[in-house]
């Protein structure tokens, strides 16, 4: 056992170091930005070091475990730990947050508060992914909403307050169900509350009660993922938020919902999950088709990308519902893959907006000549989004396909029907994706914006784009890098479905 509190340091470093931002000179914008980037890089290096030297791939149990008594009255513990399921999202969080901080370089208004909120959000997300106590998971889940709401309401478009209010209403509503589920699981069948994930994973419940718990958690995670019809906050939020915030939302926030589905609904409530899994697959299939076809009708560039995110989350839901190791591994790979691709597309959409100050696709056109570097990167990452072979999206979606086909739970005809509908969704993806590129970069449209805005991508923007592109191509060529992290844990989770 490792006694050094690696995870506690990793959770507290961003927010505690970020609080020092308020003691920096008021007009030292450049100093504030460099300080924040250095904190993010230090955090990422510390996380990578701890995982490289103390995480063993062949061990499905909790590693780097920390267990401290916190509040005696509630028998509440500060429990942290990682396994194959959480290591990928934690590393993704560090990587995307570091690049989002670099992407936020143009932000000058209330710079100290902006960067502090990004670091506070970073701490909340790492805390959620590494929690081993149900109440601690809930606290981190809620804590992370505060900086997100402030980032949405204070920086962004003209309707940012409306979109931030919509976001907080949806997520707060979902949190009520999450709290009910947490208290129900913790207080069931014992005199003392039991909130430890390991203890709860071995506990059984009456079927009706387990279904009630499952529905409560499902609603909470469906808002965050998002799963239709609880997705309507997402396009508005992405349409109005600053693009660095969009990177964090698309890259990490949506993945927290999918992570919760696997960590709690699937791992702690396996009987209810096996009952609901056919419905998850049906909803996921509908989501792929609905969001892809809705995306095609969006005039707003960022809303079109937002609907593409909803469509891609459908594959994750199908992978989780397949109850096979192939399908679940595909879902985890899609979580990581779409984290990179979604963040990259929002970043490039934001840098394009910085130059031309246009958000509607029908007002754009002919940008390829003016900004060839952005055009090249946007085209490549659009190809990654439509699952071009050799990119991470292709491997993830293919593995989810295999997962649903090889599932023993479903009959042949439903599997053929679901696969056929998923294939239609994959055909719709290139239609809206290539249409978006055509409207932005091709044609001879005359702009109403001054020509002085049309300078191409600088070194900072190129660095961010290439840094996100490299993992996308790397995972596409060698997906086993991600799959090897989660393989043992996935087998352990699925063991419950057949031998519990």
UniProtKB/Swiss-Prot annotation:
It is found in: Plastid, Chloroplast thylakoid membrane. It catalyses: a plastoquinone + NADH + (n+1) H(+)(in) = a plastoquinol + NAD(+) + n H(+)(out); a plastoquinone + NADPH + (n+1) H(+)(in) = a plastoquinol + NADP(+) + n H(+)(out). The chain crosses the membrane at residues 4-24, 31-51, 87-107, 113-130, 134-154, 167-187, 208-228, 242-262, 272-292, 305-325, 330-350, 386-406, 416-436, 462-482. It is a multi-pass membrane protein. Its main location: plastid. One of its GO terms (molecular function) is ubiquinone binding. HAMAP family: NDH1_NuoM (MF_00491). Belongs to the complex I subunit 4 family. This is NAD(P)H-quinone oxidoreductase chain 4, chloroplastic. The gene is ndhD.
């Amino acid at each position: 056992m490792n006694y050094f509190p690696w995870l506690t340091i990793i959770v507290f470093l961003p927010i505690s170091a970020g609080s020092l931002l308020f003691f920096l000179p008021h007009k030292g914008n450049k100093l504030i930005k460099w300080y924040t980037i250095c904190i993010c890089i230090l955090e990422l290096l510390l996380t990578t070091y701890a995982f490289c030297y103390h995480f063993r791939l062949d061990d499905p149990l909790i590693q780097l475990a920390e267990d401290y008594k916190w509040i005696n009255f509630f028998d509440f513990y500060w429990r942290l730990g990682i396994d194959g399921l959480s290591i990928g999202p934690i590393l993704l969080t560090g990587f995307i947050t570091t690049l989002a901080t670099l992407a936020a370089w143009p932000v000058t208004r209330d710079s100290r508060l902006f960067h502090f909120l990004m670091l506070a959000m970073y701490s909340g997300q790492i805390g959620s992914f590494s929690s081993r106590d149900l109440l601690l998971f809930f606290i981190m889940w809620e804590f992370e909403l505060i900086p997100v709401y402030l980032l949405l309401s204070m920086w962004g478009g003209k309707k940012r307050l409306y979109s931030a209010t919509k976001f907080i209403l949806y997520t707060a509503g979902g949190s009520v169900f999450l709290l009910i589920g947490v208290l129900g699981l913790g207080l069931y069948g014992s005199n003392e509350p039991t909130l430890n994930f390991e203890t709860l994973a071995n506990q059984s419940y009456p079927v009706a009660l387990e279904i009630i718990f499952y529905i409560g958690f499902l609603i909470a995670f469906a808002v965050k993922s998002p799963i239709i019809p609880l997705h309507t906050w997402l396009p508005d939020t992405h349409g109005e938020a600053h693009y660095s915030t969009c990177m964090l939302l698309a890259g990490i926030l949506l993945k927290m919902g999918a992570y919760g589905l696997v960590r709690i609904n699937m791992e702690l409530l396996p009987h209810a999950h096996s009952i609901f899994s056919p419905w998850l697959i049906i909803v996921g299939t509908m989501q792929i088709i609905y969001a892809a076809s809705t995306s095609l009708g969006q005039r707003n560039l960022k809303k079109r990308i937002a609907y593409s995110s909803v469509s891609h989350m459908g594959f994750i839901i199908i992978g989780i519902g397949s109850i096979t190791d192939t399908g679940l591994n595909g879902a985890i790979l899609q979580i990581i893959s779409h984290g990179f691709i979604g963040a990259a597309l929002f970043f490039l959409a934001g840098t394009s907006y910085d130059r031309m100050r246009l958000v509607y696709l029908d007002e754009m056109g002919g940008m390829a000549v003016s900004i060839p570097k952005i055009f090249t990167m946007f085209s490549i990452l659009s190809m990654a989004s439509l699952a071009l072979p050799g990119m991470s999206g292709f491997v993830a979606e293919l593995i989810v396909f295999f997962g649903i086909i090889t599932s023993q739970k479903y009959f042949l005809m439903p599997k053929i029907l679901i696969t056929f509908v998923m294939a239609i969704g994959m055909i719709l993806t290139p239609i809206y994706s290539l249409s978006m590129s055509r409207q932005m970069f091709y044609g001879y449209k005359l702009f109403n914006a001054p020509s002085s805005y049309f300078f191409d991508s600088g070194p900072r923007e190129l660095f961010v784009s290439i840094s996100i592109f490299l993992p996308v191509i790397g995972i596409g060529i060698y997906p086993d890098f991600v799959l090897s992290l989660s393989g043992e844990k996935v087998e352990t989770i699925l063991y419950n479905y057949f031998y519990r």
